[in-house]
């Protein structure tokens, strides 16, 4: 029988506690030597300690992984109002998954800015800042030692007022040489665009807005106040665009064209609203939602259509993209000019204003369209609505300019609109090539299949 060495159990235990992560060869030699000298009783103790040593190694390796706890924020829970502009990795913040979750590694930074909206606010702030960075400390907690006195809950970050968004005219051109405008935010002299508009500066008409739509857009931030529309300098100093969209202004404008028929068209039920091209809730966070309230993203739209089939299409499409996991590019635009009968029984084009040369501007569109394109599969579809509650069913049918594919396919079960309802807006669908045969607005992109 081998002779036991007294006290070696204590030595081994001490060795484990002092350096549990040691991989030194001498240590392993000592352990092997001691193991060979231990009696049965001490050998059992040694085996137990060896097992503990292994567990300690596993635990300490797990705890020593770099990064620590992640931050996890949700678009419906952790984002308050007035929300700052939020920049991550050099671009405006976007969720990481279809449920609106933002996931950051421990130590990742975000830039918060309230430019044009006062200063940042948080209950833990040490000083006022217009723009500042914060770093993830796990959960919903963020830190900045120069600005915050403790790790601080993200949901409490606010601006004094909503930050200012704006448009800028680019050097890029779109349909028929019109200018491309970008709408977004300026932070520390850097412009961050949310969407772009092809805008006709002669007729003051939004041709289309282009933006992306992803599965997370269905989880847009709620309880975001609607700001006033802004024009920047796009409409010039002469055109009273706010007044023209008001009940009094639109009534005065349309009465010049239809005379005594005005009461049949502009009343408590039928009137023109500011029709969004890119919808407010086509953007997931408050700073994106607010930026849709710009006149380069707007055209006159009959209220029944605005709140009827057009709104239904927006909601259904967001849900469809969410459920199918599509990553899409959307072109939402206008085409043609709607007509009304004047007091002589003749149809006339409807505009809201005439410029200094008596040229009509700000047309009331005949059609609104939404072309949805999925670049990965090169599939697309066009949805069209007639912006005119005063057309009869037969007149509307004559205005359908393509083969209405939604009317005969069960694949569009997810569409809940009422396409044959005049007040809500007669509506139909086309393949993209069929749509292009009539409407030549869109830039070139390859479409090889139908998105449905």
Task: Annotate the PLM regions.
Residues 1-48:
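Intrinsically disordered, low-complexity basic segments at termini and long loops, enriched
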Residues 32-452:
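Domain-level detector for secreted/extracellular nuclease and nuclease-toxin modules, and
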């Amino acid at each position: 029988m081998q002779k036991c060495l007294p006290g070696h159990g204590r030595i081994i235990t001490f060795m484990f506690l002092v350096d549990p992560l040691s991989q030194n060869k001498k240590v392993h030699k000592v352990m092997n030597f001691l193991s060979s000298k231990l009696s049965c009783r001490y050998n059992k103790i040694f085996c137990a300690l060896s097992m503990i040593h292994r567990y300690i190694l596993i635990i300490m390796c797990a705890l020593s992984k770099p990064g620590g706890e992640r931050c996890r924020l949700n678009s419906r829970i952790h984002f308050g109002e007035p929300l700052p502009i939020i920049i991550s990795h050099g671009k405006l913040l976007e969720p990481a998954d279809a449920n609106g979750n933002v996931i950051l590694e421990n130590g990742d930074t975000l830039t918060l800015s309230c430019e044009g909206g006062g200063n940042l606010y948080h209950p833990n702030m040490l000083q006022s800042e217009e723009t500042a960075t914060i770093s993830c400390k796990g959960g919903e907690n963020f830190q900045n030692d120069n600005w915050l006195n403790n790790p601080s809950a993200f949901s409490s970050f606010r601006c004094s007022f909503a930050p200012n968004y704006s448009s800028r005219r680019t050097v890029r051109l779109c349909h028929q040489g019109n200018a491309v405008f970008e709408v977004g935010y300026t932070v520390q002299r850097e412009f961050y665009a949310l969407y772009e508009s092809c805008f006709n500066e002669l007729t003051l008409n939004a041709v289309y807005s282009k933006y992306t739509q992803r599965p997370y857009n269905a989880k847009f931030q709620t309880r975001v106040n609607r700001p006033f529309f802004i024009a920047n300098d796009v409409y010039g100093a002469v055109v009273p665009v706010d007044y023209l969209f008001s009940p009094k202004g639109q009534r005065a404008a349309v009465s010049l064209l239809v005379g005594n028929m005005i009461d049949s068209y502009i009343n408590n039920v039928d009137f023109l609203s500011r029709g969004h091209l890119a919808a407010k809730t086509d953007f997931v966070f408050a700073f994106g939602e607010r930026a849709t309230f710009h006149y380069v993203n707007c055209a006159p739209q009959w209220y029944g259509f605005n709140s009827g089939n057009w709104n239904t299409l927006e909601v259904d499409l967001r849900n469809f993209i969410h459920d199918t996991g599509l990553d899409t590019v959307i072109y939402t635009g206008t085409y043609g000019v709607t007509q009304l009968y004047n007091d002589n029984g003749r149809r006339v084009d409807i505009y809201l204003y005439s410029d200094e040369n008596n040229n009509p501007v700000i047309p009331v569109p005949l059609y609104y369209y939404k072309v949805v394109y999925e670049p990965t599969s090169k599939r697309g579809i066009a949805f069209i609505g007639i912006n005119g509650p005063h057309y009869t069913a037969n007149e509307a049918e004559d205005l359908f300019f393509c083969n209405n594919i939604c009317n005969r396919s069960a694949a569009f079960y997810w569409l809940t609109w009422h396409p044959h309802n005049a007040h809500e807006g007669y509506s139909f669908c086309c393949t993209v090539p069929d749509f292009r045969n009539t409407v030549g607005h869109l830039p070139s992109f390859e479409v090889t299949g139908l998105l449905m």
